[in-house]
Amino acid sequence: MVLQKNWQSLIKPEKLEVEPGGEPLRTATVVAEPLERGFGMTLGNAIRRVLLSSLQGAAVTAIQIDGVLHEFSSVAGVREDVTDIVLNVKQLALRMHGEGPKRMVLTATGPGEVRAGQIQTGHDIEVMNPDLVICTLDEGVKFGMEFTVNLGKGYVPAAANRPEDAPIGLIPVDAIYSPVRRVSYKVEPTRVGQVTDYDRLLLTVETNGAVTPEDAVALAARILQDQLQLFINFDEPRPVRTEEPQDDLPFNRNLLRKVDELELSVRSANCLKNDNIVYIGDLVQKTEQEMLRTPNFGRKSLNEIKEVLTSMGLSLGMNVPAWPPENIEDLAKRLDEPF
């Protein structure tokens, strides 16, 4: 029980909101509250670093242009030289379904601008910024180009994208795989009930459209969860299982007991009474935030109640669909066994 207090005594964020930015699929602010004091900075910095470094994405790793042998060439009738075309290609935002590498093809005839939306991608790749200009062609010029696309994370320089058996004319490209463009966070104070020293975390995320900001944050949190699992070197005690009553109730029999039987401190008991909480079934449906809003109810009382409920295999914030039963008083009278 003492071991569990290390994490059970801490308040957990119960409210997660997503505030859309100018482009809802690309920019948004994810707000989480309440957090223990200091946890806003701890979680915000960790999630930000993972968002920028570790999310998988798709990027162009190499190109081939008809009639071009190397990146320091120029193409007749194309206003941009090959180096400028490569810089434009690096700005392509792609979403790829399945494993790579994949191939895309671009063919165009001048005059006019050649845009990313003209690329033939197939069913496995989506171009998220179709208005991106790849190059500009003069009258009557025919232009052909192939792209190699792959999945990865972070940044991979062009030299690492050149295969050993690269054909003549293959131009490797710096691959920026991360779908996240910018991340910032700030921590604001927030209050729960009478307590005012909690944190409110605001994560502002901008992506290239291949993943939404909300999903990006969820992926980063999952990565952190997976990496931290190794450090947990103990098994959590299992909740005490209680026998179900003969009435075949759809909930734990302890929910029918009155909170007076919990042997709480006078302060905690009075707070529950003033909030019209009679049965344990009424109590467990309350969240930590709701309890802390109760007048004169503080962290000490909250921890006391959580500890007692845990010993019974219960917790705050439970969903009890069939509560309260119509014959609750009759059922409660049958429970004369002591805890």
Curated annotation (Swiss-Prot):
Note on domains (UniProt): The N-terminal domain is essential for RNAP assembly and basal transcription, whereas the C-terminal domain is involved in interaction with transcriptional regulators and with upstream promoter elements.
Enzyme class (EC, first level): transferase
Single GO MF descriptor: DNA binding
Region (Alpha N-terminal domain (alpha-NTD)): 1-235
Keywords: DNA-directed RNA polymerase, Nucleotidyltransferase, Transcription, Transferase
Region Alpha C-terminal domain (alpha-CTD), annotated ranges: 251-339
InterPro entries in alphabetical order: DNA-dir_RNA_pol_insert, DNA-dir_RNA_pol_RpoA/D/Rpb3, DNA-dir_RpoA, RBP11-like, RNAP_asu_C, RNApol_insert_sf
Gene3D superfamilies: 5' to 3' exonuclease, C-terminal subdomain (1.10.150.20), DNA-directed RNA polymerase, insert domain (2.170.120.12), RNA polymerase, RBP11-like subunit (3.30.1360.10)
Function text: DNA-dependent RNA polymerase catalyzes the transcription of DNA into RNA using the four ribonucleoside triphosphates as substrates.
One GO cellular component, as annotated: DNA-directed RNA polymerase complex
Protein name: DNA-directed RNA polymerase subunit alpha
